[in-house]
Amino acid sequence: MKIFSPIRLVLAIAALMSVFSAPAFARVEININKGNVEPLPIAITDFMSSDGIGAQVSAVIAADLQRSGLFAPVNKNAFIEKISNPDQQPRFEDWKVINAQALVTGRVTRESDGRLRAEFRLWDTFAGQQLSGQQFFTQPENWRRVAHIIADAIYERVTGEKGYFDTRVVFVSESGPKTARKRQLSIMDQDGFNVRNLTNSNDIVLTPRFSPNRQEVTYMSFEGQQPRVYLLQLETGQREVVGNFPGMTFSPRFSPDGQKVIMSLQQDGNANIYTMDLRSRTTTRLTNTAAIDTAPSYSPDGQRVAFESDRGGRQQIYVMNADGSGQQRVSFGDGSYSTPVWSPRGDLIAFTKQSGGKFSIGVMKTDGSGERILTSGFHNEGPTWAPNGRVLMFFRQNAGAGGPQLYSIDLTGYNEQLIKTPTFASDPAWSPLLD
């Protein structure tokens, strides 16, 4: 059974650049390296179309940009000019009056072969310039993905960095009463839409993680009452056990090149970090202690590994070279630290911290300095990075009879967003950008 298939898109970059194209000194930009920034007022018009699809596309674009915390879509009721032809230069004064510093116009049309063509233009209203213009062709059922791609293009043009909207998240969906909760592996778009289940059994599943090429997921399952790490092919639905070891295997994660899986393997009462070469199926032991070493995460260059260990009496974060040498502790604050995950940018490690009766999500530099707590509460856990390294997703369990939910937060700690899902949700893992 085909669970997931890649969506083919034809992209014509700069196909819509016109005589209004902007020079390099156009003023609309956001410097996201300055910490907390003021969101950019941006007017996003309903894309022209013969049906309601154009307005739906622009609504998704607006939601993506607003959720980033870097853009503030202007209320449509304030619009003065009604865009009747997105190919024509807008009346910039009408947009400056309502302080829309950027303007997005576009259209969605249906081709004779049934495909959709979505096109957009991004304008700097104060400089009176077009900043970007692109068009995309795809099947009608993929219209939401086209909207995410357009949002990424706008984000990149204004901030100078890659966006993260055309991505997916694999997670554990949870349903049923607390005493008999069913946990399934599921996948969705990063905004919580297009949820699909990847497994359908009563066996507990935990810690799903994407491969670098986005085509595989590794996860832990208690199938047959035996905790093991599995590898699932998203396109075919085929899966296999990653190593038939006598003890528990858990906390799997791919190496950046996709050639290995790093995981924790329990043998003789101890849990240590191992790697398995997916081609030769040979394993290499990286740690050898009488403690519990788990939750390994590679640096983006594959040269180092962060992991958690209780070898010092309580859970702390350690860093080592990829061959297991040079192991050193990097967390020294109050409380215990767990679930370390290296930023795609290589500059930070995100973590879960338990201290003072609260579970917090935070980040630190890779040497342990500069620790910052982004959010705290009854139970926050399991951070995962957006592919641009600017946003984290995690799950939160509030006190009471409810269940866990997914949230996102940026590195300022101010832009926390609930990711709505049909069921309770935990253990998120963000994909790289899609092709």
UniProtKB/Swiss-Prot annotation:
GO CC term (a single one): periplasmic space
Keyword Coiled coil among UniProt keywords: no
SUPFAM superfamilies: TolB, N-terminal domain, Tricorn protease N-terminal domain
Extent of the signal sequence: 1-26
Main localization category: periplasm
UniProt key word Cell division: yes
Alphabetized UniProt keyword annotations: Cell cycle, Cell division, Periplasm, Signal
Location relative to the cell: Periplasm
Subunit structure: The Tol-Pal system is composed of five core proteins: the inner membrane proteins TolA, TolQ and TolR, the periplasmic protein TolB and the outer membrane protein Pal. They form a network linking the inner and outer membranes and the peptidoglycan layer.
Free-text function comment from the UniProt entry: Part of the Tol-Pal system, which plays a role in outer membrane invagination during cell division and is important for maintaining outer membrane integrity.
Protein family: Belongs to the TolB family.
Entry protein name: Tol-Pal system protein TolB
Organism of derivation: Agrobacterium fabrum (strain C58 / ATCC 33970) (Agrobacterium tumefaciens (strain C58))
